Amino acid sequence: MELSANGSTVTIEGNIKTIGDYNTIRSAVQGIVDGGSTSVTLQIPNSISLTSSIIGYLLKLAKKDGINVVAKIGDSRLHELLEELNLIEAFNVQKV
């Protein structure tokens, strides 16, 4: 997995699957939030999954902290997973 951040957008290339990936993503997103942003966009063009720790962290941001989380998903399998978990609205999922 490779990550890049630009403004309030985090782009994640490759599959998200390890606790190290979670730590990297959480650190980047938390840096954006700590910088005062009330919205974070995650561009995930090709991962087929998200770990439960990432899902939990993003839910905390959206539901408890009031951060507008937007997930732009490229792979239909990840989109289907988020749909099955009823997270389309919580993460403002957009299929790209």
Report each predicted region and the residues it spans:
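Short beta-strand/loop segment at the start of cytosolic alpha/beta domains
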Residues: 1-11
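Amphipathic alpha-helical interaction surfaces in cytosolic regulatory modules
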Residues: 16-91
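Intrinsically disordered or low-complexity boundary/linker segments at protein termini
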Residues: 94-96
